[in-house]
Curated annotation (Swiss-Prot):
InterPro entries reported in the protein's UniProt record: 6-phosphogluconolactonase_DevB, Glc/Gal-6P_isomerase, NagB/RpiA_transferase-like, PGLS
Organism this protein belongs to: Homo sapiens (Human)
Keywords: Acetylation, Cytoplasm, Hydrolase, Phosphoprotein
CDD domains reported for this sequence: 6PGL (cd01400)
Modified residues (Phosphoserine): 49
Protein name (Swiss-Prot/TrEMBL): 6-phosphogluconolactonase
Keyword presence, Oxidoreductase: no
Entry-linked SUPFAM superfamilies: NagB/RpiA/CoA transferase-like
GO process terms (BP): carbohydrate metabolic process; pentose-phosphate shunt; pentose-phosphate shunt, oxidative branch
MF-aspect GO terms: 6-phosphogluconolactonase activity
Subcellular location field: Cytoplasm
Classification via PANTHER family: 6-PHOSPHOGLUCONOLACTONASE
The keyword Translocase is assigned to this record: no
Residues annotated with N6-acetyllysine modification: 180
């Protein structure tokens, strides 16, 4: 079977340079969207190491645009663990503490799960909130989704060989058997990921090198979840550091301030 197009691959000499470039891209994408006909910017964030990276770089990158621009941002989360917001595993909780305290997006435009609901109801509730925020879209269309990828090839809470990879109707799905703790989560589904205008995968460190080679170069009969993210009309980009990219033989753009 033919391999899908890997998208634009950018490799940075360090995770610090990657983070700075990512923040600038978010700021530029926001400015472009806010200047357009819709005059809003919809951003979907993932957790993990992205929290500290964006917390370090994004406030300064978007500061020149001023708080009036942030008032037109809509922020959602690509997946979430079903834990209280003050729990160390809460993606929203970590962003609230480390980023949103310095990025004054109106609270009404930050779309979160209700962690007090059972996981199935939490997924339905989050889907309802997304549909309200994206009125006019048959499926929520994010201007920019920032995704991570696990050493096993998972992205969001979409894990290898899991039935959720076949989900085509729901925009948000519950998962109660995550192979990575905590087991109960809520995740965007592939139809939403592939409807986005721009998707950026971010991966750093040698621990990601082998799986990135599989995703970006191998022609697998049973593709890993991250390889199934192929935006229908949007752009797909990969931001990697040198350690994560060390096994790649496909063409990529090398970025360095040296």
């Amino acid at each position: 079977m033919a391999a899908p197009a890997p998208g634009l691959i950018s490799v940075f000499s360090s995770s610090q340079e990657l983070g700075a470039a990512l923040a600038q891209l978010v700021a530029q994408r926001a400015a472009c969207c806010l200047a357009g006909a819709r005059a809003r910017f919809a951003l979907g964030l993932s957790g993990g190491s992205l929290v500290s990276m964006l917390a370090r770089e994004l406030p300064a990158a978007v500061a020149p645009a001023g708080p009036a621009s942030l008032a037109r941002w809509t922020l959602g989360f690509c997946d979430e663990r079903l834990v209280p917001f003050d729990h160390a595993e809460s993606t929203y909780g970590l962003y609230r503490t480390h980023l949103l305290s310095r990025l004054p997006i109106p609270e009404s435009q930050v779309i979160t799960i209700n962690p007090e609901l059972p996981v199935e109801e939490a997924a339905e509730d989050y889907a309802k909130k997304l549909r309200q925020a994206f009125q006019g879209d048959s499926i929520p269309v994010f201007d920019l989704l920032i995704l991570g990828v696990g050493p096993d090839g998972h992205t969001c809470s979409l894990f290898p060989d899991h039935p959720l990879l076949q989900e085509r109707e729901k925009i948000v799905a519950p998962i109660s058997d995550s192979p990575k703790p905590p087991p109960q989560r809520v995740t965007l589904t592939l139809p939403v990921l592939n409807a986005a205008r721009t998707v950026i995968f971010v991966a750093t460190g040698e621990g990601k090198a082998a799986v990135l080679k599989r995703i970006l170069e191998d022609q697998e009969e049973n593709p890993l979840p991250a390889a199934l993210v192929q935006p229908h009309t949007g752009k797909l980009c990969w931001f990697l550091d040198e350690a994560a990219a060390r096994l790649l033989t496909v063409p990529f753009e090398k970025h360095s301030t040296l």
